[in-house]
């Protein structure tokens, strides 16, 4: 199944600054109940620089990790966050903009420039790679041979990272969990009716573990 055309109609009017301020103030009130903060920016809505900065600072003061799914033109909104998610084509675009030789070089330079802790790159058939501020990287290979669709890949990765944070998983296990969530999306027969849930994720991890055991890896 392939999505050939999508037409989203949104209002062009800017959201009143009073409303944006109220939303961010309300979000700050509930931070103490949060395991993680997720920022998803598609260039519309309430992701504005001052508000995002306030949330990131408040989360940092409360030791709450921040996960960001940024628009490439809005990376300045993500300075100092813990987890940032790119798709492979996004990293390649940034590699060209930064004029570096490899995606690895681009990833580590982005981490340094924006003070991120981790950059997660989801690559579909090429699996998942997590780059970290200490210069290390971890890769989880995709185990699927039949990839059906990719819609919702980044959303699945965000959910998996949030789960990994709540379970206090290390980077290596987080990469495996993100890869499992992405494989659930890649193997889905229909993007419209599929919803990632706990059972699907557990089943996928079980299949991955079995495949690794069979191949003795």
Residue ranges and their predicted role:
Residues 30-46:
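Short acidic, glycine-rich surface-loop motifs adjacent to enzyme active sites
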Residues 92:
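Nucleotide phosphate-binding site architecture
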Residues 81-89:
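Non-cysteine beta-strand/loop elements that form the S-adenosyl-L-methionine
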Residues 1-31:
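Conserved phosphate-binding/catalytic loop of the ribokinase/pfkB sugar-kinase fold
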Residues 14, 33, 50-65, 70-80, ...:
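Conserved phosphate-binding/catalytic region of the ribokinase-like
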Residues 42, 71-73, 89:
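Short, ordered loop/turn segments at secondary-structure junctions
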Residues 19, 47-52:
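Residues at alpha-helix caps and immediate loop-helix transition turns in enzyme cores, especially N-
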């Amino acid at each position: 199944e392939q999505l050939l055309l999508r037409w989203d109609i949104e209002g062009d009017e800017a959201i009143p600054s009073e409303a944006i301020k109220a939303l961010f103030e309300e979000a700050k009130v509930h931070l103490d109940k949060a395991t993680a903060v997720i920022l998803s920016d598609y260039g519309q809505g309430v992701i504005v620089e001052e508000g995002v900065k306030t949330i990131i600072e408040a989360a940092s003061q409360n030791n709450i990790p921040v996960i960001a799914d940024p628009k490439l033109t809005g990376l300045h909104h993500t300075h100092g966050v813990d987890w940032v998610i790119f798709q492979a084509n996004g990293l390649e675009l940034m590699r060209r903009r930064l004029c570096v030789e490899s995606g690895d070089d681009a990833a580590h330079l982005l981490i340094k420039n924006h003070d991120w802790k981790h950059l997660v790159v989801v690559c579909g058939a090429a699996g998942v790679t997590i780059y970290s501020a200490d210069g290390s990287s971890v890769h989880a290979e995709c185990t699927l041979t039949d990839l059906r669709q990719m819609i919702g890949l980044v959303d699945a990765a965000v959910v998996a990272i949030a789960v990994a944070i709540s379970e206090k998983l290390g980077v290596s296990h987080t990469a495996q969990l993100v890869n499992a969530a992405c494989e659930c999306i890649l193997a889905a027969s229909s993007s419209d009716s599929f919803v990632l849930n706990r059972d699907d994720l557990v089943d996928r991890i079980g299949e991955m573990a079995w495949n690794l055991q069979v191949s003795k890896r």
